[in-house]
Amino acid sequence: MGRTRVVIWFRNDLRLLDNACVARAATLASESSDVEVVPVYVFDETYFKPSKRGLARFGAGRGKFTLECVGDLKTSLRALGSDLLVRCGKSRDVIAELTLTGANDRTIILTQTEVTSEETEMDVAVERATRERARGGAASATMERHWGSTLYHIDDVPFDVTSGLSDLPDVFTPFRNKVESKCKVRDVIPAPTANELGHVPASVEGFEWMPKPSDLPFASSEIAMDCDKRIKDCLDERSVLDFKGGESNALARVKYYLWESDRLATYFETRNGMLGGDYSTKLAPWLALGCVSPRHVVSEIRRYESERVENKSTYWVIFELIWRDFFKFFALKHGNKIFHLDGTAGRRASWKRDEKILKAWKTGTTGYPLIDANMRELAATGFMSNRGRQNVASWLALDAGIDWRHGADWFEHHLLDYDTASNWGNWCAAAGMTGGRINRFNIAKQTKDYDPAGEYIKTWVKELAEVPAAYIADPNQAPRELRDRIGLNYPNKLALPRRDFTEMGSPPGPRRGGGGGGRGRGRPGGSTPNRGTKARVASVYDTVYG
């Protein structure tokens, strides 16, 4: 009788609570004392390579947060009597080395199901490498994929999974109506208890190692040094929250937002804020790396509704999590089209590459204060409000006419909550490339509606600290005497091209409630498609971003 090794390949599921792979490993370990469980996480070099447009995909802020998430998981596993093997390199090589090769040995790799091409190709590479290694020694290797990233399980959604979700609506409201009426959120899977995963095998070496920023395969040494600096010293005092990675911090945030601060009760009224830690849940970074599951969040919300209050705010957080699900399933349906310039609708448009405009957008020097404030916050903290994300995406893609994929790349580099499906699906939609009405944001009106006194702008654009609220949307329109008196040193608005949206088959739609297709008050959950165009997907940043 050969040995059995169970490899838990952690990726975007860095938690023990409500983790199907962990639960499956515990079950297998309970069947025989000969079963050994090896949890592993790989900082795969694939994700650190530059994008097709030359930008480093994995930035310093993401590096810091991910290291914290992995370290927290390692600590939790050690508390159970297990451990986490952490490696840098290629997942296929690392996991192949863990494959048993003795006669009649078997290796079972457990991993969370992912939906986008890079991850699924990685799955195939790991599966092939482990099988080849096992066969060389008359052993066997299999991979089990377990669904775990969404609120609704893929086996429960009322769409045809066998056809690649070809019948999934391309607008949110029909999707939401169907899943809410026909799906039940599954119960949260309990976390393992002490010794349920057994002890890691002595034959596997290197459990004591935990990488430093300099060990990660960053695209440059400068990014590694910035990552190290962020770990050692640097919470920007203007940051909305001191984001610390890991399941323990994620669960603490859920507890704080719902039970300790009671802010859930007023979420609907505050969710469009841009300053402070509690205008929204701020769960997005932990959700993106799987430090907390949406099912656990909803389970706690249901308990809150039972014990305290059920209102529009409690529902709205769940509503946002359903948006998150929508983009995950949308990516599964459309595949690599979410990365294509013409988008999922195949719309043709004239895009430009203007390095001056793109650089100004990235550095927050466009001359549009609301845009500049949001972009500076992103660079400094790795976070931006939902409201800000909608505005900066609309400005870059629809006002400046810059290839929207540069914006998606920049977000991928910086966002602590980077999630492939959400980021690329939302940017594709913001650029009008998912079909239907194009939602173009009026930045001056957005400033008036959401930062009328300029409090947020002045927090991040210090050179505007003395500008009166009446001129905060366009400081250079202030009287010369005022500008001279306060020593205003702020760039004029960049001259932008006049866009012809008729070539895209749909004129810009009117804004409603100051938000239109966004996650704010004005977002229609869906709309009637314009004649001659495909159905619309609202330009919305999922969840809990805000």
UniProtKB/Swiss-Prot annotation:
Specify where it is mainly localized: plastid
Key word Cell membrane present:
no
Disulphide bridges: none
The GO biological-process annotations, alphabetized, read as: photoreactive repair
Record's signal peptide: none
Compartments, record wording? Plastid, Chloroplast; Mitochondrion
Q: Name one GO cellular component term.
A: chloroplast
InterPro entries registered for this protein in UniProt? Cry_DASH, Crypto/Photolyase_FAD-like_sf, Crypto/Photolyase_N_sf, Cryptochr/Photolyase_FAD-bd, Cryptochrome/DNA_photolyase_1, DNA_photolyase_1_CS_C, DNA_photolyase_N, Rossmann-like_a/b/a_fold
The record's listing under SUPFAM superfamilies reads: Cryptochrome/photolyase FAD-binding domain, Cryptochrome/photolyase, N-terminal domain
User: Keywords for this entry?
Assistant: Chloroplast, Chromophore, DNA-binding, FAD, Flavoprotein, Mitochondrion, Plastid, Transit peptide
Start and end residues of each Photolyase/cryptochrome alpha/beta domain: 4-151
Q: Name one GO molecular function term.
A: DNA binding
Q: How is the cofactor bound?
A: Binds 1 FAD per subunit. Binds 1 5,10-methenyltetrahydrofolate (MTHF) per subunit.
The Swiss-Prot or TrEMBL record lists the needed cofactor(s) as: FAD; (6R)-5,10-methylene-5,6,7,8-tetrahydrofolate
Feature: compositional bias, Gly residues = 511-525
Q: Name one matching Pfam family.
A: DNA_photolyase
Q: Where are the annotated segments for Disordered?
A: 497-546
- Origin, by domain of life? Eukaryota
Q: What does this protein do?
A: May have a photoreceptor function. Binds ss- and ds-DNA in a sequence non-specific manner, lacks photolyase activity.
What family does this belong to? Belongs to the DNA photolyase class-1 family.
Please identify the protein, giving its name as recorded: Cryptochrome DASH, chloroplastic/mitochondrial
Q: Which organism is it from?
A: Ostreococcus tauri
